[in-house]
Design a protein with these regions (language model features):
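Short, intrinsically disordered or compositionally biased N-terminal tails of bacterial proteins
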Residues: 1-9
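N-terminal helix-turn-helix DNA-binding core of bacterial DNA-binding proteins
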Residues: 12-52, 76-84
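Beta-hairpin "wing" of winged helix-turn-helix
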Residues: 62-72, 79
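Residues within the DNA-recognition helix of helix-turn-helix
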Residues: 57
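Residues in and immediately flanking transmembrane alpha helices
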Residues: 32, 39, 69-70, 92
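Conserved segment of winged-helix/HTH DNA-binding domains
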Residues: 2, 18, 77-97
């Protein structure tokens, strides 16, 4: 079976995903979300960072479809959209070991 080269669009998306993951805070957020959904307050508390800073990082991840949101009352819950992103985060962290 012959593999074809990725399209320019696929390369653009992959490059953007890797750029967003290259930030320690965003990678930490994605790592936390491997275990399930969390609120911005819970993420900020776990990372010992201010809520507004975490909100800005989540907005960037959301724009790239790297996190998804679910509203419940006045709370927003963040999670990873699929197992491919989870695997990418796990593999990146294993590579660092």
């Amino acid at each position: 079976m012959t593999e074809k080269a990725p399209t320019s669009t696929e390369l653009d998306v992959a490059t953007n995903v890797l750029k967003l993951m290259a930030d320690k805070t965003r990678l930490s957020i994605l790592s936390l979300l491997r275990d399930g959904e969390m609120t911005v307050t819970a993420i900020a508390s776990a990372l010992n960072r201010p809520v507004p800073a975490i909100s800005q990082h989540l907005a960037k991840l959301r724009m790239a479809n790297m996190v998804q949101t679910r509203k419940e009352g006045t709370s927003s819950f963040y999670s990873q959209p699929d197992e491919h992103l989870t695997n990418l985060v796990v593999n990146a962290l294993h590579f660092a070991e």
